[in-house]
Amino acid sequence: MNAPLPEHLRHALATVTLDDKYSLKSGRAFMSGVQALVRLPMLIQERDAMAGKNTGALISGYRGSPLGGYDQALWKAKSYLEKHNIVFQPGVNEELAATALWGTQQMGFAPPGTQKFDGVFGIWYGKGPGVDRCSDVFKHANMAGTTPWGGVLAVAGDDHVAKSSTAAHQSDHIFKACGLPVFFPSSVQDVLDLGLHAIAMSRFAGVWSGMKTIQEVVESSATADINADRVKIVLPEFEMPPGGLHIRWPDPALDQEARLFDYKWYAALAYIRANRLNHNVIEGPNDRYGIMASGKAYNDTRQALVDLGLDVETCQRLGIRVHKVSVVWPLEAQTTREFAKGLKEILVVEEKRQIIEYQLKEELYNWPDPQRPRIVGKFDELEGNDSGGEWSVPNPMAHRLLRANADLTPTLIAKALAKRLLKLDLPSDVLARMNAQLSIIDAKERAQNSLVLNPAADRMPWFCSGCPHNTSTKVPEGSRAMAGIGCHFMSVWMDRSTVGFTQMGGEGTPWIGQQHFSHEKHVFANIGDGTYFHSGILAIRQSIAAGVNITYKILYNDAVAMTGGQRVGERAEGHTVVQIAQSMRAEGAVIIKVVTDEPEKYSGVALAEGVLVHH
């Protein structure tokens, strides 16, 4: 038990450092999913150098959970990034960051002799709401295209259960609407491997690649293989149109659309197929039941099988085929059809709204009845009703199999899987084992549900000690305030007469819609300095343009406190009170006051004309 470690292990452990994830040239290193996103562009640049190309990279975006610490990780790794020609330039907001990355690909038609590198690739990052607001940029840039040694990866941080968001998010459908193929890693190693494929596919097919990440993956840690040549990229045979698929100028809009619809997506599919990005992980000679899963849901499905007592050998014995989908849109058809052949039924396991399930149903719809497997996912069939569709009955709850809201767990998946498998003719030993395991699962669930927490132990989140929000979110008696995105959102559950909120950058503008129809004459709106810098100044401009009577409390603490305390504006001096006051005067605000517990700080400071300082 206390025997000394072998010498080779002791030597290996003695040389381990926290910087291994960035400094090692080969081997394995311990890292988180976020740190893998830092190492990823280094690996891409190293592979390019191995191919004889001198490339650079731009990383830009806007912080937000579960990618809230990505910018800090990039800053910490600055010395390593610089050695790989990688520039990190945070965006004022998500869409401007995406536009900057579009600019890296426009170097494809820059004047001859002006470029320092053979190509510049890019990584965009943002939270789910940031994906929403970037759709215009994504569509334009994706249709315009990429360069042969450029390429762009857009990384979305999705909060499926609204753990730190005002709404649950699923970026798959936004990426799809913008025409970006969607990668969904299930592990730290996947972040590296699929990230390499995503940029390679972006270069080959002339599209931007999307990558969906969630907390359970990017905030997990693991030992990953960091060899630059680990991933063997296969460029498929594909008949390119005249002029190829890359960015060019001039390029009429309808030509771009036709190139995307008729060639780019199919080039991406050829890449997915050639590199087996979607593949069977469990299969046998007599398979009859199929399971398709992606991302976190794939991990949960494997755990659900274990919880039911179905190891790999038992799955092969029963004829259960498991298919891992790493690119959820577009769903590669040939691989999908091969997976579906010979199966009687397929269960699609994916969190949130259907994206794989609908594509699978479309792909197999015209198969002859004897060959076409039944497909279930979010819903199964009712007794006497074979539809199994989402809109088949007035109340879908009656035949819901795997919920689309919130998230999925191994327990939910195990119950759904057991419900379907128990319809099969299972061997008696397997049947007995599954029923025993289900009893254990049910017992655990009952035990958890029986736990009653003492309400007195509840503790709602509150402002940090010393934070100016403790006092600045209070309003005079008889007044009310509107909330928005930021730490000050917490005032909605405090006794501060704060009701309602908006999306980031919309703070206060609901009053424009209300004031014409209300006897109220005035409201307050809270807005943090981080949101103000991001997009909130436009909400203030809208209120001034509309001429409404509103007081904006620009809550200044010189930090984006919710995501790590980063400086506002990404500059050493941050975004100062003086700058904000001058901007508000220029926008036409009638009364501007600085309220502070240290008024002496502004003695002799050249604030905008008419700005008063109050204690």
Residue ranges and their predicted role:
Residues 40, 44, 73, 77, ...:
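Generic, well-ordered alpha-helical scaffold segments in large soluble proteins
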Residues 1-40, 44, 185-451, 456-463, ...:
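Flexible, low-complexity linker and terminal segments
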Residues 454-475, 493:
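Cysteine-cluster motifs in flexible loop/terminal segments that predominantly coordinate metals
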